[in-house]
Amino acid sequence: MSFTRLALAAILSISAVSASQAGDATKLRVATEGAYPPFNYTGADGVLVGFDVEIGNALCAQMKVECEWGTQEWDGMIPGLVAGKYDAIIASMSITEERLERISFSRSYYNTPSTIVVPKGSEITEVTVAALSGRLIGAQGGTTHSVVAEEIYTDSNISLYPTSEEYKLDLENGRLDAVIDDLGALEGWINSEAGSCCKIIGTLPIQTELHGQGIGVGVRKGQEELADRFSQAILAIRENGTYTKINDKYFSQDAFGE
């Protein structure tokens, strides 16, 4: 390749990066976990589905961009974004102070409380610290709900799992006394055949210092314009009714929050 062509390729590459950093990209690579029903999971046909995915597609349509979805294990989500593997995270990720030190976020697109589920027939009937003292509680590691469990239930034993599916299996088989996760995730599960073993006993008040500022779209530092585009799109689909149509497919309550 000649020097002129190399120079031109470099200029085009820099221009493309600059456009992406300015939030003007027309194609975005979006990461989700693909293992957190009903928010994001792989259907029987191998296609990504769920609330996060449908909201993400609606946001992309509103922004008039093409979104290319990819799955990533939870612990690798932020490192992958920072390394440039993805342009955005839409994966039920809470906007917390700790995460804001590494990445930026849009405004929240849902905000629902931590919820406790126990086996049917359990003698545990309350979500108080005393009621769960000495009990074994399962949670997905690295999530806001695992932080809530460790900060609030200090007299309980907290067992962390790589995915929500694994703690559900242990609860179903009597290896856990309770689990903690998002209301939407657990409500959908207990209302399915797979979750018929168990029941919700209560929710915890949303505390910003623990739960964060709701669930947002994550982007790299320096791409605040892209975050703003997502924020504007969130408000637009909320206003035009698209959000409600998607919400009502998955939840019995409005997940949007305050």
Pin down the residues of each PLM region.
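Ligand-binding clefts/hinges and TM-proximal coupling segments of bilobed small-molecule sensing domains
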Residues: 66, 144-161, 198-201, 231-258
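Periplasmic-binding protein-like
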Residues: 34, 111-118, 191-231, 253-258
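Extracytoplasmic small-molecule ligand-binding "clamshell" domains
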Residues: 22-92, 101, 240, 253
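Alpha-to-beta junction loops
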Residues: 64-66, 83-91, 135, 172-185, ...
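A ligand-binding cleft/hinge motif common to bilobed small-molecule-binding domains
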Residues: 76-79, 93-101, 151, 177-211
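Short helix-initiation/N-cap motifs at beta->coil->alpha
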Residues: 53, 69-79, 124, 159-173, ...
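Ligand-binding cleft/hinge of the Venus flytrap
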Residues: 40-42, 56-65, 128-133, 145-164, ...
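Flexible hinge/capping segments at coil-to-helix
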Residues: 119-136
